Amino acid sequence: MKKMTRNFIYLVLFAFLIWCFVYLGKKDFSSTITDAERFSKEYTTIDTDNPFVYVNSNRVLNILNNETGIILVGFSSNAWMQEYVRELYPVLKENNITKVYYYDVIEDRTKKTKNFRQIEDLLSKYLKITDMGAEYLFTPALIFVKDGKIINYDDETSLVSFDMRPDTYWNEVAITSFHNKINTYLSEADYN
């Protein structure tokens, strides 16, 4: 009788452990953060109430071919990108821009994915030529699209002298010029 009770308890405990593994294996422990919060973590000078929405290469292709919007192409580990975003954000805020599509290009560019090559083809007249003679999507790049047509393209700091640093490049004159240029681009279409 004692042995039977012990076996029953073992069986119940075993069933409970199996149930725990199944339950905990399906449970999503990740906390949900918004794109704006994620962007703010990657670009620490930007607050969490920002218009940046993460998109993949499929979405970028769809915007470039059919839609209206602003696409920011880059990656957060780039110091030039960090400064570019820091200077871009106030202009977006002033103009009440509610959505900027952010395409983190690093993985697709490294792997030269099919979609990335299609994006390069669509942007070919805006791309710079490398020393090897190939077109290359340098970042940061800001693309203004209206009804599937690129109307403006800005990659002001994508090719800067190797001895120049972002904090020395962005002086008062450069900031004013950049803000004026982006304000002009934003006035040419309704991006909201």
Model-derived features: where do they sit?
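N-terminal Sec-pathway targeting helices
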Residues: 1-14
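N-terminal, intrinsically disordered, polar/charged segments of Gram-positive cell-envelope systems
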Residues: 27-72, 94
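Local sequence-structure signature of Cys/Sec-based thiol-disulfide redox active-site neighborhoods
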Residues: 59-105
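Short, internal strand/loop/helix patches
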Residues: 117-135, 145
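Non-catalytic, surface beta->alpha helical segment in thiol-disulfide oxidoreductase systems
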Residues: 135-192
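Thiol-based oxidoreductase modules, predominantly thioredoxin-like and allied folds used
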Residues: 45-54, 73, 97-124
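Solvent-exposed loop/turn segments at secondary-structure junctions
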Residues: 76-80, 106-110, 149-151, 158-159
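Hydrophobic alpha-helical membrane-insertion segments, chiefly the h-region
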Residues: 15-25
